[in-house]
Amino acid sequence: MDAQHEVRTADGVLSPRGESRPVHRGLIFAIVALALLMMSIDATIVATALHALRRDLQTSIDWAGWTITAYSLGFVVILPVTGKLSEQYGCRRVFLGSVAAFTAASLCCGLADNIYVLIVLRGLQAAGGAGFTPAATEIIVDHFGNARDRAVGLFGSIFAIGTMIGPIFGGLFVAYWTWRGIFLVNVPLGIAVIVLALCYVPRDRSRIGGNRQRMDAAGMALLGGGLLSGMLAVSHLAERNAHAWSPAFVIPLAIAIAALWMFFRHINRSSYPFIAPHLISGPGFGTVNLINALYGGITSGAVALVPLYASNRYGIDALGSGTLLVAQGAAAIVFSFAGAFALRRTGYRRPMYAGGVVIVAGMLLLALGPLAAIPPYAWLAGSAFLVGAGRGANNPASRNAGLQLAPEHASTLAALRTMCMSIGTIVTISIDTAILAGSHDPGRTQAWLFAAAAALLVAALPLIARVPEHRGSW
């Protein structure tokens, strides 16, 4: 057996090419899935606790909303760093460190006594959670052998479950306990993940430490500063009375443009770039990253505003409008699961085309409104279901696309994918809410925004022809 490709599994048995025994694959997947579920729940769980935060911490609803913004900003900025750290220091180490940081920050969030401390801690919590996806992807690639394509594809179901049940759990904690419970519940879960990972996730391969490169601190600073400034700029648009010519928008946007220009200039000249340029914009990779940003903006960004649309245009109450996203989440779960197991037969492009067409149909139906005697709630739920089905069909393919070209960069590619989708989501929500804030008829305006999103996706569908195609396992 080639020593370079040996790895010791949790029971001490060597397996070729980093492949764990089937019984341990299930345990490993369950461990990383629990971490991903915990992180994805926390992305949405705070939404239903904002009024409780405002009351108990004696603050405004705007400041309470920054607990969500801080999580989004911290997550996006730290993602590429954790991807690189997984490559340099090992995915198991980064996974354990990320879970420990997330758990500690969650405990501190639950004990916070003012809104300003809570906002900072939410950013730190997100920084810990940002390491979950890159490290988990690398763990799957390293230890699942020929089953890794399906395991990575199933991640989409986990995220859909988390984002769907997050607001429900948040409401239950606020109603029957306290808002602090939405953070404190992560402590026993995080400890359980750490203990299980120490016992069952195989150690990182020794070759990682031997090929460690010098970390590109300048590249990390430029990308982090550019992303943070850019996200602050677009987040400002979502605030009340915000204007595109306001210094609070123009200054951070200018800083973001300058920092990102310097970042790309730097990595093209550096001997040890923070992220290899071809992984961002090279053949195949650049197309996948652009598509992920567009899909994230539409399926996570625009669709997140469906409850607001239901209320503004059709007068549906808060409970009814909130449950509309359950239809979208349920469809995403089912079709992500099915798509992960069909991927070897379909390849990447066919489900991405099919998913895109179904998403377009769902968005157009949302914009059009109910026909004949169909109740508005049923129409909106059916439309949201279609968007979720398209999202689910696309997820396994878009998660795997490109990975087989550079499996040694699996953690960085996973970080780039999640970062692109998150940026698309934040930008879309910020722009849409800014437009709606200045509208005299927000319901009808939002319908046009849904139609515009559908048109944008139609224009982007030809890009799928440039996605690297692959059938079978890799």
Per-range role (PLM):
Residues 110-117, 198-204, 234-240, 264-267, ...:
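Transmembrane helix-loop junctions and nearby membrane-interface residues
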Residues 1, 170, 185, 218, ...:
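Hydrophobic, well-ordered secondary-structure segments
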Residues 176-291, 298, 453:
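Hydrophobic transmembrane-helix bundles of small-molecule transporters
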Residues 24-50, 57, 61-70, 74, ...:
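12-transmembrane solute porter fold
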Residues 148-158, 212-221, 280, 349-356:
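Cytoplasmic-side transmembrane-helix entry/capping segments in multi-pass membrane proteins
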Residues 2-200, 357-360, 364-367, 380, ...:
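Transmembrane-helix bundle of Major Facilitator Superfamily
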Residues 49-53, 78, 187, 195, ...:
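Hydrophobic alpha-helical membrane-insertion segments
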Residues 131, 225-228, 301, 393:
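Residue-level signal for the membrane-embedded core of alpha-helical transmembrane segments
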